[in-house]
Amino acid sequence: MRRLTFLFLICIIPLLCSELRAQDDSCFSLANNKGYITDKKSVNKTFSQNSSFYPFKSNEIISGLSLDVDITKESSDYLVRILLKDRDGAEYLVLEAYNELFDEDKIILSDYGEETLLLNGICPDSISVFVRNATVVIKNITTALPNSLQTGKTYIKETEALKEHQAKAKAQRINNYNQLHKKLWTAGVSSLSKKNYETKKRILNMANDGNTGGLDYYIGGIFEVGNITSSKASKNQTSSPYVDEFDWRYRHGKPDNYWLTSIKDQGDSNFCLFFSIVGCTESLANLYYNTNLNLDLSEMELAWCSGVSSPYGGVSLGDYDLPFDYLVNHGVCSENSYPFIDTANDHCRSENINTNELVKASDYYHYQSNPDENSIKYLLINGGPMSAGIHANGIWHAMVLVGYGVIKQGDAINTLVNNYTIQEEDTLLIGRTYWIFKDSSFDYITHNPTDGYVYVIFENCSQMGEIYSILTPIIIPGYTSANIVCEDNDGDGYYNWGIGPKPSNCPSWVPDIEDGDDSDINSGSLNMFGYLEELPPGKTIKTPVVYATNDSTPYRLGIVNGGVLTISGTTTLTGNSKIRVCEGGILIVDGGTLQNADITMVPGSTLIIRNNGVINMASGKEFIAPVGTIVNIESGEIN
């Protein structure tokens, strides 16, 4: 099993909140922008629910805005977000506060602004306050008159620098909170964290009163959705009949991006659902045909041609089935034919669709009842990667669900600056399932193996949103079940043929029970709960190996393609030991003796006996060379 180890990607420096403010407040202060002529207005408005007000003159133009605000929180799941809206309808983030950013009961912010510190001469219309479980008092509004120096390239450069500084400061706040509260994830600066508010809102399909909890700053570790620390893991979680860890990325010992295709970027769009569906389909095609097909399908076609009413801005719940129906009934062409363009103003370009390359799914299954962990684990293990995501606290973001794990006492968290090991007292975490998602909204720059994947614990599985399984076979032009690869790569006698029933092109000697891990000769079949059958100890021979001494072996030996076992001494098979020579494998007895032999030859395998080598079969065992094997006895014998 893979040990639960996550690499936290930035150093966490413990600071008190007051100390933190002293260091990072300058990038949130309008007064820090030199050259501004400012105007301060007294407001003294109190808000305990969502509301808007209009403090601006009809002809007013501003280049910056900050607020003096007092926030009194009523619970830890509070949210405050204040937006400036201009007369064209554009929204700018003035401030946002949630527990990971500000965890004091009383928060006092003076001359505070975020995006609104640098505005390119806008006409302000209103200020909107979104509030949950808190009371907000806006005392003063400070605005800056237009500044002729902040235009063109200068404005863009200063805006990008401000985004960078603010993102670093907010990530540091979150990391201090995470360290104080023993959270298992790390915040940092990514392209998503530096997006403007409207873009970030669109990418995450977020409501104005949505609480990200810092998701937009996630760069590694296990993110939490909901109030995980409110109670221990349920009995259903801790007594699950399913295996503790399962991950489609590494099934059968394959490398990264073999079963799962590479990480894609949805840009500034809300195409997460389409990227999720395409990601599932590409991966299921690999898993169904049991090989890497290197498919790259068109999210653009699925978005604009499936009938979704406004794909760029977000998919309504009523439209959710439409792209799945399109995948089944029409199919999706390649990215090369219909490439992704990050634009809100587009339509279905049917002339781009190459009908000779449409990839289809057989059907899909929409999990519509209240999901529980065990049901999701069953679908994932037995059906492959799924479309799911995060649907909680005003966020609705689809991803590809590829695996899960269960947190256990003793699991190690490596943070670069220290190691945190899950302790016995971490009762609120032990037994909880974390889910592994392939994402399309985060631009990672760390080159860590987990880049592009998000690990999430949910308070309850209903927060995973709409859950879909795409059903095989995946229909690809020019491919049939005869193209499914049927192979034994570990030499245990079990064969792997991917997801689905045993294909007719498997050789007649292939057993009906599929190999659960074709990279491990010690593991046999996989049951519905994800547990592997344990086989007697064995060794896979993949390269040339020589047994030159007189010795015995208790191991089952699987000689696979590229493997050569040469026996030049006396080797005695004991216990459950036997030799299986697979397609492309070679067994050579070169002047040595193989005693008590139990040998299975597979068509395409080779046996060579030379220099008076001898094979003495075990009692009751007969040497059989099926049609298609090569047996070359230059000098020697088989008894």
Task: Give a label for each model feature.
Residues Y242, F246-H252, N270-E282, D296, ...:
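Predominantly the structural core of cysteine protease catalytic domains
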Residues L7-L15:
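Bacterial N-terminal signal peptides
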Residues C17-A22:
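Boundary at the C-terminal end of the N-terminal hydrophobic targeting segment
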Residues N527, Y531-N639:
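Extracellular beta-strand-rich, repetitive "passenger/adhesive" scaffolds
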Residues V43, S48-S63, I71-T154:
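Beta-sandwich interaction modules
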Residues Y155-N270, F274-V278, L284-L297, V315-F324, ...:
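Structured alpha-helical subdomains that flank or immediately precede key functional sites
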Residues A482-M528:
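Membrane-associated feature with strongest affinity for ZDHHC
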Residues K40-S51, Y364-N370:
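Extracellular beta-rich ligand/substrate-recognition surface
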